[in-house]
Amino acid sequence: MKANSTLLGLLATSTSILDNVSLFGSPGKRQEATPSPFGYKAGSPASVANLKDKIKHVVWVLLENRSFDNILGGVQRPGLDNPINNGDVCNPVNVANSAGATLCTRLKDFDSIANDPDHSITGNNFEFYGQFAPDNVAIQNGTITATNQGFVNKQLISYPTITPDLAAAQVMGYYSDKEVPTLIDVVDEFATFNYWFSCIPGPTNPNRACALSGTSDGHGSNDGNFSIANISVNSIFETASSKNISWLNYDGTNGAFPPDALFYTWTAANAKNNIVPIENFFQDALLGTLPQLSYLNPSCCGLNTNSMHPDGNVSFGQVFVKQIYDAVRQGPHWKDTLLLVTYDESGGFHDHVPSPLAVPPDSKTYTERAHDGESYTFHFDRLGGRMPTWLISAYTPKGHIEDMGTNPATGAVEAYSATSVLKTLGLLWDFADLTPRVSNSPSFDHLIGPQMRQDTPLVLTPPSPFPNDT
């Protein structure tokens, strides 16, 4: 299939963008890529050959709306870039008064919070830059850099009747080791990405589409096009079918909204039978009948759902992760399966690491009106918030913390992001990059080792419920 239409100059300009402004927003700062745990160079013939030899099935699940610091901020494991290891960080109650009161990250979060943080594009702008409509040119040249100081203030703008301390508990709080035991198992046993960012600084559907297509097709909100299969760009589903790669979208949405494969006009016209109930996944995993690509939609987004999207419980989401892992681990496909657990976006929760700039996927822009009435146009030239992401298989290194990757188009040090999945799947299944964003995304093929581990747990630790916000 053809790649999505793009600006021809984007690939050529990517080097200068990353050279002039650092990965995390401060001019001149450079970071090193993480040394390969197995000696493979990402994207090299040897690494790709090993990936193809070891991995025959991929299971990919996007959970919902949690930042790295929110989920892993209280996990005391060496190497994790989080508040419990590095010290708590603070936000002003009012970004316009830097000398005023501040509130800090803390070991105080809720299994579910009542007030969903703003995760629109202009909401993210305020949380990252302290203003709804920052100057795009100044962001690109480094005159304005993200400080991630606006989370408490934005929560108070969204919910003016709550106290500042409750606002901070909701958006700055993080979970303790005891509250996320299932996820700690994954950290201890497999590979955790320290710096993995969402595709765009915006809400759910554009981020899910961008993860699946390498572009949100110019969409920056959860508009009605996603519900009527009106996204016309190529996706991993269309691409897989064109390469005779078997796939299923296991649908756990319970009819609340369409599963992600049905964002696309092509799927609605050609592959509706590839969408099956989520229950089928567990029987297919245990029976050894999984397709080459399994894409899982969790339930979302209120009480008694398992995506972790507020006000769904984090404990329910951990149960979902455990169910997926346990089924794959106990099934015959474990020996050749790569399980990727990530999130769609950071959901308006605080994270102390600013988001990097990024190569635009195409020439499209998106304009929205902010809470204060300002108009802002986004050019899809920077990533969204940092999110937890785990690589799980019989071949991933035990307890590995992966920091930075390498931009395959430029050789520059680069943070991982949602489109790193498409880049890696392209290496595995021999399909072309769908957009320039994918072409500039680090792959993670080098994290698959040459020998199957014999010490992976048969099951993950179950979570326990803990108090909700009210």
Give the predicted meaning of each segment.
Residues 23-470:
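N-terminal pro-sequences and low-complexity stem/linker regions of secreted or lumenal proteins
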Residues 1-27:
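Fungal secretory targeting signals
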